[in-house]
Amino acid sequence: SLAPWTVEIHNGADDNASGTAGILELGWRLLRRQSENRRAILLIAFSGEEMGLLGSEYYCKNPLVPLDSTIAMVNLDMVGRLSTHGRVEVYGVDTAQEFRPSLSNFARSLSIQTEFHPEGYGPSDHATFHQRNIPVLHFFTGLHKDYHRPSDDFDKVDTDGLSKICDLVELAVWQLATNPDRPKPTSPGTSLSLVG
């Protein structure tokens, strides 16, 4: 907590109920289109991120499917404040050759402002996969004054913005799930996983 003087509940609406809600929404959307998939899509909500990526590390050591069959990891962490910052940050866009041009086209078609970051490192669960040379994308709407405080409540979540981000992520995941080719990793590594 960044408010250690209080015993108030920290609901974590943006960090990271927004990401969990995004996963559930994407699961519903992708389920309706699953007959077109070439690959399985795993929806995973990890725990222990704040304590050192414990959940994603455990998964990578005990995967449901072999990690060499995992073609990408897409992470939604703090995606509930699009209206606050006016853009979604996407990390890992250069971890596979296809990511940057595809996401640019998708964002343009949806009129979503983006800020791209090439690296796949960072303090969230995607980093665990990137360390294992799996291409990653991490969607994030930025830090704010409610981060890790009791004031991170639902009334501050931009639900329309979260829906737009889900539109963008859906296009990216759908391309990964239906493209016959695996993404081509561009840099070695030092929740949503796609298998195929």
Indicate residue ranges for each PLM-predicted region:
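Alpha-helical metal-binding/catalytic segments enriched in His/Glu/Asp
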Residues: 1-53, 169
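Glycine- and acidic
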Residues: 3-12, 85-88, 150, 154
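Charged catalytic carboxylate motif
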Residues: 22, 102, 164, 168
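Sec-exported extracytoplasmic/periplasmic mature domains
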Residues: 25-35, 61-65, 104-112, 170-181
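Metal-dependent peptidase/peptidase-like ectodomains
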Residues: 46-144, 158, 162
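Extended, hydrophobic interaction surfaces within ordered domains
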Residues: 133-182
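PDZ/PDZ-like peptide-tail recognition elements
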Residues: 179-196
